[in-house]
């Protein structure tokens, strides 16, 4: 099942032992186009936003509008705090995945025929010698990025389309018709050749002339998105 990031914004999140908050955003790797974490607002419960690895998502029931996580309230309450003044780096992510008993996704895959080693819950994940920035993007951050086709600005990125079974970002939702446009188009991430976070630009290899003339599905879109009331 596929969903735009804005469609799961505000969705209630249930832990094993009860409701914990609502989904606020998705964080994805713009190189592999894979969602790594969901940002969850715990509101009155714990009073902070937390990042939870998508590997802990048990299911997302779109018809009922509920996301169920395979972890407890206590696990979420005791999860490592992200420091607002620091970028998310390998050190923080290492502590986060270790807290949830997960293997780091950046670890090298096992050799063919050799089963991966199980990682005990609470065991420290391996951290590179330098704590490089993870360079994750959020759905909220990429909203508003310019879409640049071979040096020409052709539109504005509005959202990402996510496969909720694989957590892969398959397409970008882009407004190619200006601020007053009522139509947007989905553009596959295949032609994306780079994401310039400093200047807020997504670069694609497609020529400006071909933008808007592909197989992208025309979709009704209202901006800004207002999540349904809980």
Predicted regions and their residues:
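Peripheral interaction segments used for macromolecular assembly
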Residues: 1-230
